[in-house]
Amino acid sequence: HFVLRTNMLQKQGFFSTLFLYRTQVNLVHLGAIQLSPQLVPVEALRRSIQRALKHSQPEDFLYSDRQGHKKLRQALSEHWAEDGLYIQPEDILITSGCMPALSLIIQQLTEVGDSILVPTPSFNGQLQLLASLKRKIIEIPASHAGVDLDRLEQMMQSGQVKACLMTANYQNPLGYCLTNTEKAQIAQLAERYRCYVIEDDIYAECGFNLERPLPIKYWDQAGYIIYCGSVSKSLSSAYRIGWVCISQQLQSFRIGLLNGNAIVNTPLQLALADLIYSRSYREHLNSLRPRLMQQVRQYQEYILKAFQGVKIGLSQPEGGYALWLEFPVQIDGLEMYHFAQRHGINIVPGEVFGEDRRYRHFIRLNAGHGLSHEICQSIDKLAEWVKQKLDSTDS
């Protein structure tokens, strides 16, 4: 059944708590999906910033183009072209991260009270954004295999939804990657029913294969796929640079997007352009991907060992570094979250990934940090709590 609810705003206070905890340095961070500083190419970033400042022009220190610096837009266009995705620099709008990009385009394409379709479980930040913008959320179920395209077509055809918000490559929290056939079909459905698909492709460069998967945008013929992303997950969460790509068919929205966009830090834009042109970013990705795969596999092995004797479901992501854990229904993820906080561990309870409590016995873990002794101890502590809970309910 399709689910239409509006109770996400009731969780806003809890979302604020989640964001507060993810910045505390004294916690074991298994919650927010972010790379370990050890995986960030700090020296390459420093060199790029120095070169960008050295070769900058006087006009680079004035208010810059709201669309983003031309050098960065050109660099991104050429970078994507190497992976088979062709987007012109003039169609790229630089934003201060992926969430601002999503917010911009949602406000341009839809109005307060419009319904947005989201496959769930879905990144809680997206759901929070939709709720804060007073858009209604219509959920269709996603699984480790991807999205039910028959259900997606049924909703598009019904005319109930104004747009869809989805991730095709290494979705958070499930980690699936849709096939090229499925992506092409989504683009065709969007055109057939004139329903915009806002594609969040933030994890595309975090796959376990060296070849980057193509986004839905690749098959877009009529401009109904709006492509968004950033380098927050592939480079550094502190590097607040993202984009939204508006095709020629959407030029009527251009003025609204530009007026709503905050000017992004110019030196950082130039530094990212330098990182791309110097090949340092490509080298970083080639190094990052196998390390992520190894790291995620280590987490999976340790989690299965720690929870031995407990019937759990554990995601098998093809990329990214989110892990989605399902426990027996007696286990309450929110209760586990509070237990973890009391013991200096940060996790994310499953119920914030959908509008009702169907994911209450799930949690999401971050595998972006190396599997340290401290993290192993934290996983052991969670496993011990789960086993005690199950023993008490059985007795």
Positions of predicted regions on the chain:
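N-terminal helix-turn-helix DNA-binding module of bacterial transcription factors
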Residues: H1-F2
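N-terminal small-domain helix-loop-helix segment of the aminotransferase-like
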Residues: R5-G97, Y277, N346, K389, ...
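Pyridoxal 5′-phosphate
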Residues: L30, Q160, L304
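Conserved core segment of the aminotransferase class I/II
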Residues: L45, Q221-P290
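Conserved core of the PLP fold type I
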Residues: S56-Y193, I198, A204-A222, L390-D394
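Conserved PLP-binding active-site segment of the aspartate aminotransferase-like
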Residues: I246, W324-V329, I347-W385
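Conserved glycine-rich beta-strand-loop-beta hairpin in the small C-terminal domain of fold type I
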Residues: R289-Q300, I312-E326, M336
